[in-house]
Amino acid sequence: NRKRNMSENKKTNQIQPPEEIVLCGASAYNQKFYINENFKNLPDEIKNQLKVMCVLFCADIGGILQLVFDEEGNLEFRTACNEDDLLYDDIGSGLKIKELRQKNEDLLRGLELYYKVIFDKLEE
């Protein structure tokens, strides 16, 4: 499932920048963690918490996990898996995300606030 990074404005056929920004992600397939360079100024402790959260999710559930800011600055958990991945736990995925949201509520709320402050400044 390849996601579109750019959206097309139907009236003028101009290419617009994406309205969503990936904060970080991890993959059980290549066993890697990624954090968006736009967030390199986050404290190391927060980056480490994100890494642990994403990597452990992929180790437990499988597939790919991304934390994505939507156009309003809300942080969403997105999962995906290869079509032939029989080990991916689809039901466990939803339960694990709910658990992570509850356990890391303060961290996630702080990241949303950080995003809104930083990216509102960039748009001015």
Q: Over which residues does each language-model region extend?
A:
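Negatively charged, low-complexity tracts enriched in Asp/Glu with abundant Ser/Thr
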Residues: 9-60
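Charged/polar positions within long, soluble alpha-helices
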Residues: 113-116, 120-123
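Alpha-helix capping and helix-coil boundary motifs
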Residues: 6-7, 92
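Short, Lys/Arg-enriched N-terminal segments with co-localized hydrophobic residues
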Residues: 1-5
